[in-house]
Amino acid sequence: MFQDNPLLAQLKQQLHSQTPRAEGVVKATEKGFGFLEVDAQKSYFIPPPQMKKVMHGDRIIAVIHSEKERESAEPEELVEPFLTRFVGKVQGKNDRLAIVPDHPLLKDAIPCRAARGLNHEFKEGDWAVAEMRRHPLKGDRSFYAELTQYITFGDDHFVPWWVTLARHNLEKEAPDGVATEMLDEGLVREDLTALDFVTIDSASTEDMDDALFAKALPDDKLQLIVAIADPTAWIAEGSKLDKAAKIRAFTNYLPGFNIPMLPRELSDDLCSLRANEVRPVLACRMTLSADGAIEDNIEFFAATIESKAKLVYDQVSDWLENTGDWQPESEAIAEQVRLLAQICQRRGEWRHNHALVFKDRPDYRFILGEKGEVLDIVAEPRRIANRIVEEAMIAANICAARVLRDKLGFGIYNVHMGFDPANADALAALLKTHGLHVDAEEVLTLDGFCKLRRELDAQPTGFLDSRIRRFQSFAEISTEPGPHFGLGLEAYATWTSPIRKYGDMINHRLLKAVIKGETATRPQDEITVQMAERRRLNRMAERDVGDWLYARFLKDKAGTDTRFAAEIVDISRGGMRVRLVDNGAIAFIPAPFLHAMRDELVCSQENGTVQIKGETVYKVTDVIDVTIAEVRMETRSIIARPVA
């Protein structure tokens, strides 16, 4: 009799509208209960039975109940699920399969089945890609997933690579395709095969994309020709190979191997500037004055060269530092190395005085065995030979940025605007507390930014530098010329790595249009979005594989007295993150390991300090000794403890 009663329906509607609700993100705990985090200040308790309806990370709307002064949340509506597509480990076999997502806070197995047409018989321990199909807040009885891709078996030594690439939906192999003949681009190529061009790379590098030639000029000037591999001589715009490169956007460099943007026949052979092989190049000829400034007579042109030597970073550095056994194979090559070192010094000084120079951080290299096991991790400091190449490339990219800006007004530019204007006052206030006075307006200009950076570099420690990093904006890829505050330059456009960066291929095509005096079409902004997204995914993949390998490498050190020097990189309420100086691994030190009495301990992310009883004991950038307390392989996390 009450079924269609309009009064009852109205009452229900009224009750519903009067019941308090909140939208937020579910945070799970290891104890079964959870919290609905509405914002940084407000969260509501979710009891264990209600947590069965949701998953960590779900964005939901919940009804808020108040009982005896205590508020709790009852999940009501799903706004956005945390899991859609994910990777995980399969449990069970045949008809009764479940998958445990590979995520530190998702421990529960989700019932699943293989998608139709997936011809793999899943078994315990297999890694798979899955997609969520059912959710309790969508009216389903339980969570349910569908296995859409088999990744590999549980004991595969290369799990870190295959699982990571599948997680980020990145390619596992080089693209297919061959380029059989060079295009007729209507370019006149200068024959520079007689010049003593050299390449300087790691011993294992196959995709050499830059060769250098230097010569002394009158009036203490130096000439530098930077010759860059020319894949756009083989790959037509809009062709199948071009489209594949556009999607990949970059070569993906992971520990142990890379997945190239172009087919290996091109990246490692046809386009690679191998010693004693004639190759087409796009080249830039520049004159450097005595103080290292690049003069205005910049010239871009097409050419053919023949590299006369494949030099190796460490050998060149040793020779310039008068150590080691290696000698250049001829006086002509020796003279090239000496001139290039001179150019490097001049350009380094010019950038130090007129732009900005990054502090040198070592590169960490994983040395892997046949089965992907980590034999060692070595820190490779940036030496003179690395700097020779770096200075030459930066100079060449400055030239391209100028030419594209002046001749076309567009290109693919790396733009970094320094500090976010919204943060300028807070930044000035923070610096003032440390005795540095800056004008909030001035610091938003390129000159003001450079001035501040130089003052920070002159500080005895990097502490203040680390405090202001959060006020900086991110570097972006733009079709519009703009400044690069991080480098201290008015404009910066890369073209020196076209084998491994699609944006550099675009700039090659634009520079060729300039050389031929033709009009060019402005690149579409969508391509910069794709490049930025791919760069983000590749970096995450590199980090994920690295975390896995670090965990493998340090597992046998857990619980031992082996000491590691570690730099504090971040402090949060829960503890400190540190980077092991010798190998680059990131480890976490939980707050209880810092001091047993929690009420005497203050870990402040805001100040970058840890205080015990009001005394600052640790701060970001401090280097301390730690031991490895535990390595959790399932989450690839390393827990460290300070040495007392």
Swiss-Prot record:
Keywords of the record, alphabetical order, are: Cytoplasm, Exonuclease, Hydrolase, Nuclease, RNA-binding
Cellular compartments annotated: Cytoplasm
- EC number, as in UniProt: 3.1.13.1
Domain RNB residue range list: 189-516
Hydrolase as a keyword of this entry, yes or no, is yes
Q: Name one GO cellular component term.
A: cytosol
The chain positions of domain S1 motif read 561-643
Q: Which PROSITE patterns match?
A: RIBONUCLEASE_II
Keyword Nuclease assigned to the entry: answer is: yes
What InterPro entries has UniProt attached to this entry?
A: CSD (IPR011129), NA-bd_OB-fold (IPR012340), RNase_B_OB_dom (IPR013223), RNase_II (IPR011804), RNase_II/R (IPR001900), RNase_II/R_CS (IPR022966), RNase_II/RNase_R (IPR004476), RNR_Ribonuclease (IPR050180)
**Which chemical reaction does it catalyze?**
Exonucleolytic cleavage in the 3'- to 5'-direction to yield nucleoside 5'-phosphates
One BP annotation, GO: mRNA catabolic process
Q: List the molecular function annotations (GO) for this entry.
A: exoribonuclease II activity; RNA binding
Q: Which SMART domains match?
A: CSP (SM00357), RNB (SM00955)
Tell me the HAMAP family matching this sequence. Answer: RNase_II
| The protein's role, per its UniProt record | Involved in mRNA degradation. Hydrolyzes single-stranded polyribonucleotides processively in the 3' to 5' direction.
UniProt family annotation = Belongs to the RNR ribonuclease family. RNase II subfamily.
Q: Which NCBIfam families match?
A: 3_prime_RNase (TIGR00358), PRK05054.1 (NF003455), RNase_B (TIGR02062)
Protein name per its UniProtKB record: Exoribonuclease 2
Give the organism, scientific name: Shigella boydii serotype 18 (strain CDC 3083-94 / BS512)
